Amino acid sequence: MQLPAASGAPAPAQSSVAGRAAAAPQAGQAAKPPLGAATAGVNAQPPVAAGSGAAGGGGAGALATPAAGSGAAGVAAPSGAAGTTAAASSADSATALAALTSYLQQARASRPKLAEQPFATAALSKADAQSAKDLLWKDFAAYVKETRKGEVGATENQARTIKVEGNDKVLKYYMAKRGTAPATGWSLFISMHGGGNAPAATNDSQWENQIKLVQDYDPKNALWVAPRAPIDDWNMFFIKEIDELFDRLIVDLIVFENVDPNKVYINGYSAGGDGVYQLGPRMGERWAGAGMSAGHPNASSPLSLRNVPFAIHVGGEDTAYDRNKKAEEWGKRLEMLAAEDPGGYINQWQVHAGKPHWMDMEDAVSIPFLQSHTRNPIPDKIVWEQHEYPRAHFYWLAADESNRAKGALIRAQYDKMGVHISEVKDVKKLSIRLSDDMLDLDGPIRVDLKGQMLTEAPVKRTIAMLDRCIQELGDPNFAFSAEVPLELP
């Protein structure tokens, strides 16, 4: 929904939910404006309830989806096996869980590959799958703590550096804490600075300014992380390598700083706002919300924002590259998408009348809007559109490398009857990842495409599938226990 035009102080974000308005924070003295990259309102659909349908806790890494019939953990039986189940015997399930416990007690360096152990592919009961997930997450977190100590401990005055093997870019960041950690963990803001195609010293100055903006934006009970862009160019926050670096940063902070993975937000100003337009949809499964200030969308698309509350704030006089016009176009597009898809595309947008590139902190109204929302890691409906740098996974869907072309599109949802795919473009193989928080995995799982049944077959909860998800994504909320691989017509 479009926010009302500002006059003097920032206008409160109007909510259509229960007729209540969210009060705007009191802006402090404005920091110097970042460099970089009218009319107004909020489409505030009901926020996703905290933990809605979720299991518990964020991640990193590329995904390898097994082919159908490969014997991989969690693979569904062939189509036509309807009426049968892969229910685990209690004895076999308990034996597998005991074997996992013994395996994890071994010294890490001497462990054989988990996926090759007989217990890894044994069928688990629902209760034992939850216990296995807890054990595997605890072991993963211990490994992160053992191997990544040098990547954490950043402060407002001391930066830390993240480097991922095989990635030639590095990510430096400052961090500030506001308030106290709730029982569920800190909220996290990844706040991207302005600058862009400028000398390194200019971008360094913008980076140092971004950590100071925590005082004006004033997030509640949150970690405010200001990363330094890996390059000094116009696309500095949406290069291919940034996904892996941000994934790593999020996992580190979940493990070391007790960040709630369902309360991770991204925002940015100017060139940082350019990055939000790109990474908001591209890495949508990571975010509880995304806030764009004074940026330009370039060729990005909002379709994948179905489950990511998105805020847009631009000055009415910010005419460079038509930022003001593009902001209004995106705001109206999100409103249209929200009207067509009730419950999705929650948005807040405002073109601030009379304001140039620097909005004197009027965009701070985006912070309480974002923090009013919590990520649902297993939304019942998703829209996944691949962007310039495709990703291997999106919520509970995954695609192998040959099915990740730019522009590839999948619309899918699930309910108690099964999984329903309503639209597919340029995807021939797809993996549906499942947990007991989504469907009853003790019965056959039905999948249909445009109403035509593709399969109705049992699935198997396995330790191998749980471990693969945790190792790839570093988020216990994405620790799926079963999988249905599909070949689409």
Where are the regions that the model predicts?
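Active-site machinery of serine-nucleophile hydrolases
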Residues: 185-188, 192-255
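Primarily recognizes the serine-hydrolase "nucleophile elbow" in alpha/beta-hydrolase
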Residues: 262-306
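C-terminal catalytic histidine-bearing segment of alpha/beta-hydrolase fold enzymes
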Residues: 319, 325-327, 331, 335-420, ...
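Surface-exposed beta-strand/loop patches in extracellular or lumenal glycoproteins
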Residues: 425-443
